[in-house]
Amino acid sequence: MIKLVLIRHGQSLWNLENRFTGWTDVDLSENGLSEAREAGAILKKNRYTFDVAYTSVLKRAIRTLWIVLHEMDLTWVPIHKSWKLNERHYGALQGLNKDETAQKYGEEQVHIWRRSVDVRPPALTEDDPRYEATDPRYKTLKKGEFPLTECLEDTEKRVLAYWHSEIAPILKNGNKVIISSHGNTIRSLVKYLDNLSSDGVVSLNIPTSIPLVYELDENLRPIRHYYLSMDGEVPEGEIPKHISF
């Protein structure tokens, strides 16, 4: 049996301020730092270990992973970073307060932008100061690859490309893997692993910094999955439902 651990980064500063974040490189809040430490303690108490780790190129996911591995005394574990594990790009919504955006565009429209599978928010323009294609971390992206906005389907496409090319072969070779990433990135991966419909993923919530364990067969088909706490598996009815993309 193969085990995979997924973890959404701890609360970020913009989660705290209720702002759309996307690809903006926002750090963890004090609460987020504490959440990451607790996640590491949970994994250590439950006797987990890892051979390799994956994360995005955004500091909130990277720092969460660093803290988790530090708490587990696993700072030697190789870490692979990829923009393909970044959060969904929220286009022109990035940096905006969610409540103020709902007042401007209507709650229904904002709900569609946030939760639908195939509807993109308004796009950034290339002259927008929030356009980050010149950032050195994205220098390997080809022309047209850097998104101006994304729907969940767009996010899923790049996440699964990286899953199939990089992560799946490592898992099949028997390595223990942890992925520290983002709400919509993990939603995309869970949608694929559990073969969820578009309707099914709409209501899928990923809580911050609580380890999500997938037990997989040799073909990486899920046997079962569960969240972890200090006391072991979290009962289904006690899984936190909060979410903030």
Swiss-Prot record:
The record marks 182 as: Transition state stabilizer. The active site is at 9 (tele-phosphohistidine intermediate), 87 (proton donor/acceptor). This is 2,3-bisphosphoglycerate-dependent phosphoglycerate mutase. It is an enzyme of class 5 (isomerase). It comes from Bacillus cereus (strain G9842). The keyword Isomerase applies. It holds the Pfam family His_Phos_1. SUPFAM superfamilies: Phosphoglycerate mutase-like. Disulfide bonds: none annotated. Substrate binds at residues 8-15, 21-22, 60, 87-90, 98, 114-115, 183-184. HAMAP family: PGAM_GpmA. SMART domains: PGAM. The lineage of its organism: Bacteria, Bacillati, Bacillota, Bacilli, Bacillales.
